[in-house]
């Protein structure tokens, strides 16, 4: 679970090898509450927890929370409660070998709705939760004018209200792992919570508890989850990464090949931005300017030898030298 070499900048997990880690005895499960029902988390964090549980690690189960109001995704919420689990299909290529493997994820116990199940959620959060996941999108950090501690609307307000309930119930420590694609997402979320706590006048003692007992890590997630499966499930590419910035006061309580705990997220961020995202932007520009077929996929556009050559030349001449200058040549080439 620690970063020990440059090679670990690119943990390639094929979604098939479940033989990682030593099997351990499950003594007391670490219950997780997850805000967000997205297909991304279904094929990312939720799948990782399932894999860890398969080796006997004491992590989970997960209770998923639908924070948005309205009836959309109600069918998905109900489906999360099936003991049969849900499918995740890992489809793509590893080392020039095409793979397609279907897994059944059973780490999710149930799903709740904030507007319907607030009392149950409040009790679960106050007394039983040990870890929080979230993926509510960039706009999910935006506060709402009507937010109140007794009637929160936005995700940060919901989270702060639940944290206050936990504080009043005895205030056990808690680990929060935000998965939103926001730079320094942990720091950003903490800043919002602290400011809102001041506005709500929750008091100095609560503020100190929030600072010392609630661990919020910066994280970076990476995986292409191309398609949802109705009512619940997803299709994803083989490559996956969850880079978590190390907190000296709290160990990440499970291991998985795609999870890396590091003192520095910057190299992972640069690889994602300047190789993966740059490549997508480059291809999108070609697709637009050359008026290529509207339904063309990435695989199809890269089957054009001339375009693939242009992309590889961009990487070789303009991207890889920059990484090499910072001692990341091997990591960038593998990525």
Describe every region a protein language model picked out.
Residues 5, 9-335:
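Substrate/ligand-engaging "lid" and interaction regions
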